[in-house]
Amino acid sequence: MKFTRALALGSICLSAVFAAPVSDFDANVAKGLRLIQTSEDTAPFWATEDQKLDLLRADKGFFDLTETYHQVEEQKAKGIKAIVERATYPSPSKSSTVKSIISTLSTSRMQSNLATLTSYNNRYYTSSTGSSSSTWIYNQLVSIASGKSGITVSQYSHSWAQKSIIAKFNGASTSAAAVIFGCHIDSINLSSPSSGRAPGADDNGTGTVNLIEVFRALVTAGFSPARPVEFHFYAAEEVGLLGSQAIAANYKSSGKAVYAMINLDMTGYFKPGSTEVIALVTDRVDSGLNTYLRSLISAYCSIPAGTDYQCGYACSDHASWNTQGYPAAFPFEAPTVSENPNIHSSSDTTSVNGFSWTHSLEFAKLATAAAVELGSV
């Protein structure tokens, strides 16, 4: 999601929503309304789908709480807390292994996978192509993991057509806190969400193919971590972080422990003429995990960590995990002023000036390093 414009447009949209009480939840859902929250400081409110789109067009970040509302309320009533392994993240110590696996990362494979993803008219969460593109990703992951022990690939069904996917290295200690890498697989054209052309090359084809390639490289290398290492491919990020909210809430309700969650969303662009960096988001993240990522960037990447910046409320899937109480981080393609201006339209392609495969590769390197280093402790 994009998060840089002034919020005046958002306030115009907010004035039109329904201030119905949450106590009328089931009745409002039956009317087709959605429960929306736009900041920690404001109460949730009801909005139509069209009003939700108005918020998106105004670049107003929000959670759509509708799908997880009852589950989260149950967590509060029962006093369920996120299980987090609170430990100091280790200094990088697996240099030989990390660099060996990094050397096998292939931009040509990422290019090929992205060509397939962008060939779908769009990957909107309710569209047939949104569903079929998710199935294609699932099949790629299943093929990569075929015949390998200790690895599972599963689909995560939602109330909408597009499924999320979880590919998992079970780890020697299956009950240990998991290292999670996440990306969203959906795309959107804000002019015509359900049918408009939305190649979503950078948002978020890049993060998706990064994680497919990292998963492949780890499987090929015979990666066998000490703890679970998971790769999540989330449906429906563009419309209120629906997929990641569902999975994060499920992990909390199920008592699953998390060591770190690292989100890749847009990794392929930096503004021509700007300094090439890996930007680290500072809001709704774990500061200790950010510090650790800086050490990995210094050790394993060819470009530096950039000036930290805030991306805004509910800007991407890391926020779902942070809200549930888990440590999360979000390395991003560029500082806000240098991010891709072509997203959420038919122009989000690899041909735009500023798109760079060598830049995107740096994020695959970072994810590989984090998987090996964090998965080994």
Identify the residue ranges that each predicted region occupies.
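Fungal secretory targeting signals
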Residues: 1-21
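Primarily auto-inhibitory N-terminal propeptides
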Residues: 18-86
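N-terminal hydrophobic or amphipathic helices/low-complexity stretches enriched
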Residues: 69-127
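Second-shell loop/turn segments in exported
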Residues: 96-105, 119-129, 151-155, 193-204, ...
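A non-catalytic alpha/beta surface segment that caps or lines the substrate-entry region
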Residues: 112-170
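Solvent-exposed loop/turn segments at secondary-structure junctions
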Residues: 122-125, 158-162, 171-175, 185-189, ...
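Acidic/histidine-rich catalytic neighborhood of metal-dependent amide-processing enzymes
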Residues: 161-164, 195-288, 317
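Active-site-adjacent substrate-binding region
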Residues: 270-377
